[in-house]
Amino acid sequence: MVTNTSGKKKTAVARATVSDGEGRVRINSQPVELVEPEMARLKMLEPFRISGSDLRGDVDIDIDVAGGGFAGQADAVRTAIARGLVEHYGDAELRDAFREFDRSLLVNDVRQRESKKWGGPGARARYQKSYR
């Protein structure tokens, strides 16, 4: 059985394909073990730590991720993996475990960066004003 899921965070979008296999996890056709920095890799593999690593040996997960930076991509990937595992196994207990740990494992974080406006260096900050 093949399951397609996706995850989003900021401008990063991850599309995951979960299929029966022997535990390979690939990010952009590269083994997840080669992902740097390590913090991003650990974030991506959180769903396996919560579910128990026995699930990882039964499935192959191929993920294509684009957009954003490494932190946003890591969050998008972990959402895609968690959704894929829940959908692939159809396990309500697994879904509840993910939801209890962190709701963003199953639900996309829709917050976006506020755009810069004129009259200042950022969205809310204004340029310094001088009276003399």
Curated annotation (Swiss-Prot):
Pfam families membership: Ribosomal_S9 (PF00380)
SUPFAM superfamilies noted in UniProt: Ribosomal protein S5 domain 2-like
Entry keyword annotation includes Secreted: no
Entry superkingdom: Archaea
UniProt keyword list: Ribonucleoprotein, Ribosomal protein
A molecular function GO annotation: structural constituent of ribosome
Any GO BP: translation
Any one GO cellular component localisation term in the record: cytosolic small ribosomal subunit
Extent of the signal sequence: none
Family per similarity comment: Belongs to the universal ribosomal protein uS9 family.
NCBIfam families reported for this sequence: PRK00474.1, uS9_arch
Protein name in the entry: Small ribosomal subunit protein uS9
Lineage: Archaea, Methanobacteriati, Methanobacteriota, Stenosarchaea group, Halobacteria
